[in-house]
Design a protein with these regions (language model features):
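N-terminal targeting/trafficking signals and adjacent low-complexity tails
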Residues: 1-66, 71, 76-80, 86-90
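Short glycine/proline-enriched loop/turn "hinge" motifs that connect secondary-structure elements
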Residues: 83-87, 127-132, 187
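Short amphipathic
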Residues: 83-99, 137-142
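Long, charged, low-complexity intrinsically disordered regions
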Residues: 88-90, 104-109
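Short acidic, S/G/P-rich loop/turn micro-motifs used as interaction or catalytic elements
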Residues: 99-102, 143-147, 202
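An N-terminal amphipathic alpha-helical segment
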Residues: 107-137, 144-145
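Short, hydrophobic/π-rich interface segment
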Residues: 143-186
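C-terminal edge-of-domain segments
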Residues: 175-219
């Protein structure tokens, strides 16, 4: 990547950052109680711009330095707070944010790339299960301090690309015949997404445990 191309790319990033700054100012001046829909639109726009900026910055880093993609994205997973654990036959993946809307590859890339390398690093020191028949549960947790109008339909969320990443590590196949998907919306202390992968025989027990400990506002 030559100097002229780098400068052009940086100017594009600066323009995106300026748009983000303007949107954040608008958010700060919007009465969230009187105009929750406007605030929701602005916050969504700001979040998408932030993801776009992060992804563009990654590509600039890869193209203009000697930083390896795998090294950077492993660090990005740590910074984002992605956590992976296993307990009682359930693989749990914690994402400290809500799932992106279906708005294009870059919005998903912000999350899926670090997740892939975080799973890869975890697999280096842990023996991951390989499920033949499984259930993958997406728990979409919204901060109880913010308006319920923020809750989104599952059909508008980008789940398929995330499922493909997880499937590469723990599933023999993510087809409908071998994998059932379950979504739940809950209230919590902060926005986040918890993904639980388990054998079908474990699902009913997991669901009962979840209902006993979490306050749910809707299930699907």
């Amino acid at each position: 990547m030559n100097r002229a191309h780098i400068s052009k790319y940086i100017n594009s990033l600066l323009a995106d950052i300026s748009k983000l700054s303007n949107t954040l100012c608008a958010m700060n001046n919007t009465d969230i109680e009187r105009y929750p829909d406007n605030y929701g639109m602005l916050s969504t726009d700001a979040a998408l711009h932030s993801e776009l900026i992060a992804c563009k910055m990654r590509h600039l880093l890869y193209g203009s330095t000697n930083m390896k993609k795998s090294e950077y994205l492993t660090s990005a997973g740590v910074v984002q707070g992605i956590r992976i654990s296993e307990k009682d036959g359930v693989l749990n993946i914690f994402l400290p944010r809500l799932m992106p809307r279906r708005k294009g590859r870059k919005n998903s890339e912000f999350l899926t790339d670090p997740l892939y390398f975080t799973l890869s690093q975890y697999a280096d020191s842990h023996e991951l299960p390989k499920f033949q028949h499984c259930v993958i549960c997406f728990s979409h947790i919204y901060s109880k301090e913010l308006p319920l109008s923020r809750v989104r339909d599952y059909d508008n969320l980008e789940l398929k690309q995330l499922l493909d990443v997880i499937a590469a590590f723990v599933m023999e196949d993510d087809s409908g015949l071998l994998c059932d998907a379950y979504n739940t919306t809950e209230l919590g202390e902060q926005d986040c997404t918890c993904i639980s992968v388990m054998g079908k025989e474990r699902f009913s027990e997991w669901l009962e445990e979840r209902e006993n400990r979490l306050k749910s506002i809707s299930d699907f």
